[in-house]
Amino acid sequence: MLQVPILKQSVSMNASVVIWRLANILCVEQSPTDYVLYYKRATAYLSLNKHPSALQDFEKVLELTSSSFDKAHLMKARIHAKDGNWTEAKESLESYKSNSKGDDPSANELTSQVTEGAAAHKKASKAARAKLWTACEEAASTALSVASHSIEIRQQRAECSLAAGDIEMAVGDLTYVRPHHRTRAAFLLM
């Protein structure tokens, strides 16, 4: 039975989020082999940008369906692309394409985005090593258009922006990066 004091103790969450989480836990506990529940929860996590939790649930979907639920592969590829994990994104896309029937335009588009993002990320790294700061900043921006949640690429763009004299861009990136670091010490070491 859910008691009101539990809701009052939750400072960082409102009551509806707590109720949603409890309902999800109860649903999954009551039917742990229902892959649809895991898929729905994974898509909810994805919409909340909780990528590790979403990936975990998509993995569970694939485990329960013997990797036959191809949409889970596509969703994993999208998450990996947003995080800048190019190899994992390509692997998930290959799994999706090998399991899906027919040609999927959204998978083809994601494939080209992953290819473009990976190439831009590589170009940004080369430009940074060559101290071509503006080229690095532009290439990192292109990579971030695909990998919008990549801390590594955003840090790289911030460093290149600082070196190029674009303080405003660097501050924007560092403002995004800082909340994603676990400790202040890690942020200061950047």
Q: Model features per residue range: what roles?
A:
Residues 1-190:
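Alpha-helical tetratricopeptide repeat
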